[in-house]
Amino acid sequence: MANKREYPLEKTRNIGIMAHIDAGKTTATERILYYTGKIHKIGETHDGASQMDWMEEEKERGITITSAATTAVWKDTRINIIDTPGHVDFTVEVERALRVLDGAVTVLDAQAGVEPQTETVWRQADDFNVPRLVFANKMDKMGANFDYSVKTIKERLNVTPLPIQMPIGAEDEFAGVIDLVKMVAYIYDEDKLGENWDTVEIPADMKDEAESRHDAMIETLADVNDDIMEKYLEGAEISVDEIKAAIRQATLDQELFPVMAGSAYKDKGIQMMLDAVLDYLPSPVDVKPFVAHDEEGNAIELTAGDDKPFAALAFKIATDPFVGRLTFLRVYTGSLKSGSYVLNATKGKRERIGRLLQMHSNQQNEISEVFSGDIAAAIGLKNTTTGDSLTDPDHPLQLESMDFPEPVIQVSVEPKSKADQDKMDKGLQKLAEEDPTFKAETNPETGETLIAGMGELHLDIIVERLRREFNAEVTVGKPQVSYREAFTKQVSAQGKFVRQSGGKGQYGDVWIEFTPLEEGAGFEFEDAIVGGVVPREYIPAVEQGLKEAMENGVLAGYPLVDLHAKLYDGSYHEVDSSEAAFKVAASLALRNAAPKGGAVILEPIMKVDIVAPEDNLGDVMGHVTARRGSIDGMEERGNAQLVHSFVPLSEMFGYATTLRSATQGRGTFTMTFDHYSAVPKSIQEEIIEKNGGK
């Protein structure tokens, strides 16, 4: 058990590997682990043998679902790697990873360049100010084109790429790369799993092109670096070290994004990519100070260092079959020994760290202490959930929490037997702890269990995990859309609840003004009572009554959202008034306001990006309009077209099959939640009728 810092902070890298699905990201991570000596046999994703894809569901589907954290050592530096999913249903895993990373490697498919999901994860990385390198992977693939990939970075991501290599050959002829910084060539030995390569002079027939690309690289650097600009204008020699220092600074400032070439599957270019991680991506010391807040709400800037009070963020909860509940931590400042107490500043509870583990995919090495800049997993934290701040009990700090999107799709799940009921309940509770975008609840009227998530694949995998990890056999209903309800007009209404039939009666009377708010604003309650017409002690009951009534909506039983309620008048009875009576009165006011408040049903609208061959463009546009969608623009993608559109989620069920048959399997689409919008009147009536009205 190691207990002193093995690698200085400057020699630590916390990086993520991010990409569009099928760009070869998991294979690239595998190769990193192989060359850094962490694994002895390479696992291929398409054989279901990859180390990082450790859940059974991932092995079967060949996609990465949970971002496994692993640690590796390259040269004299420790690299903590978080492998993130590329499928849109799992964007929350990407957000979680980016929140705690210092830098990232974006893997592109060199034939496709920047794809829709690349754009999504790139924008997420922008939100978290994460410096990035780009690795144009699959250079051995038919149609691979490095220059095209670089062009797509510029055009689709709207940033300045900096090619620091050029490939030697492409497709079957891909043999190695030219290093434009050192101006040498690396030619790989075909037989040795990429472990051997020769550093040679640039081939004579490529020398002129390499020179001109080197000059272009220097010009791009000169635009963002005054020292390079000065030497460039004077025609002075610029050393390799000066070039590297300038690239590093421009990468850290996110002014430039170095681009490299390789083929993870054919074992080419990975070691150079690792060198670039060391040369150009930040250590915890290089990143901007992290902002936290003390108990008074004052902003405090945290910079990495072991000699400061302990502060960490819990960024993921996972259930391990052998050790139970694992809490993944990113330590920002200070150090922590196993067995010590921490304060969960988010929940205001003290917790004891049982054991500390360093993770390698799903295998663990026990350690006795973690330090500033580390990523590790803790056992023993019972009350900690994703996004909680863990700090030194004497120095409580609130690290900025994470925001997660609300689920947009739900299905009912029913246990097949009584024994399955308990297993299912336990499993759903555990899975909801792990994943903030997954929710499970019981419908109070029908008693059925509903699970909600970010997409069909997300829920498929939840059900699969119930079966596999918790032995719960369940029947799954048809997917349903998570509709909402909203007012569209300002309206005032009275709610009066009076019951006087012998004995103690009930009396509550309120006047409330309801004002619709913009999407995502939530519920706001305003107490505007003057002169005690509604006594103080009943006002919280009015607010609570409204909240409970809003949960069940006013039209078809869906939650009513984004509403400001101003309680401005009412009356009470000395004897008969009670909290319960005012709760009922508040719910009646809401019900009475609905007809004049222009209540509507809102549906989730998805951003749907469809890539289809040119010949099928007419069909695809027809698909969008037939599904009540709108086209938002098109771009050429080689000999295919990318159609940007917005389509209601309710119309997208089963679309994968439609697209597959229309394009003979050549079309693909990605779908992410964009916003909520009112459904057309006719559809609103159908929904109300189907739900039996209110």
Swiss-Prot record:
Domain of life from the UniProt record: Bacteria
GO cellular component terms given for this protein: cytoplasm
The keyword Membrane is assigned to this record: no
Record-linked Pfam families: EF-G_D2, EFG_C, EFG_III, EFG_IV, GTP_EFTU
Residues of the tr-type G domain: 10-285
Keyword set includes Cytoplasm: yes
Keywords: Cytoplasm, Elongation factor, GTP-binding, Nucleotide-binding, Protein biosynthesis
Subcellular location: Cytoplasm
GO BP, one annotated term: ribosome disassembly
Major place of residence: cytoplasm
GO molecular function ontology, one term from the record: GTPase activity
Record-listed GTP binding positions: 19-26, 83-87, 137-140
PROSITE patterns linked: G_TR_1, G_TR_2
Function statement: Catalyzes the GTP-dependent ribosomal translocation step during translation elongation. During this step, the ribosome changes from the pre-translocational (PRE) to the post-translocational (POST) state as the newly formed A-site-bound peptidyl-tRNA and P-site-bound deacylated tRNA move to the P and E sites, respectively. Catalyzes the coordinated movement of the two tRNA molecules, the mRNA and conformational changes in the ribosome.
Family label: Belongs to the TRAFAC class translation factor GTPase superfamily. Classic translation factor GTPase family. EF-G/EF-2 subfamily.
Protein known as: Elongation factor G
Native organism: Limosilactobacillus fermentum (strain NBRC 3956 / LMG 18251)
